[in-house]
Amino acid sequence: MKKLRIFSVLLLLAAAAVFGAFRIYEKGIEDHDAPVIACQTDLISVSVSDGEEKLLEGVTANDSREGDLTSRVVVQDISEMQEDGTRQITYAVSDSRGNVGYASRKLQYTDYSRPVFQLQRPLMFPLGSPFNVCEGLTASGSLDGDLTDKIKYTLDQTISTAVEGSYTVEYRVTDSAGNTSYLQTSLEVYDPRDYQIDVELTSYLVYTPLNTPLDVGAYYAGADWTNEVALNIETDLDTSRPGCYYADFNVSDGTYSGKNRLIIVVS
């Protein structure tokens, strides 16, 4: 009986020793090293329409135990645009044990442009009628396409549809690169009895380059009126300075009159 107890104790000690040795061995082979990502260049130039395959061009990944992991590399993040016009793109890759490696490089676009606004109708609204300040206004960008649902605005005062007048409004829209475009202009609440003639324009908002002449009269499409009318264009346009300007198209047949407005952005 005594020999049996001694044998049991020895067996237990042997099992403990084997288990301990196994744990030490297992710990010795645990993988704590993250895969390493390498980028062929520090800067990649792409089109705004290029997908992830193009963004991964020249990127490889290798793990000390599992070897080549290039096929597992993903784009983890793209920062907002920096002052120099580039963004930082961050890549990530994970091995089978969950160790994650990262790498970053600069990204620049070959065809990027900031968001712009479009206007389908004049910012003129009749007295007594409810309206949406963003009515007829859309926005788009080369990077994201339609940005209309991202438009925000600020008014310098509360608008009353019962009081005619001009109200300053600033529209703004931001794309996924973090760039914000602004449109600071005015909208008008008018008495429809003052404007009996419908004045038609081909556009209601145009962009023109700095120091480039613009023929605002070319945007006049006519007046919906049976009698002959005289056209008078009033504008504060100065193409030598960036900013938002207007051109008012006033028509009259001597008795009745009409008006429409073109907004001009010089940039």
Regions found by a protein language model. Name each.
Residues 2-12, 65-105, 109, 144-189, ...:
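Serine/threonine-rich, repeat-prone extracellular segments and beta-strand-based repeat modules
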Residues 28-66, 113-146, 194-227:
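Solvent-exposed, low-complexity, repeat-rich "mucin-like" stalks and linkers
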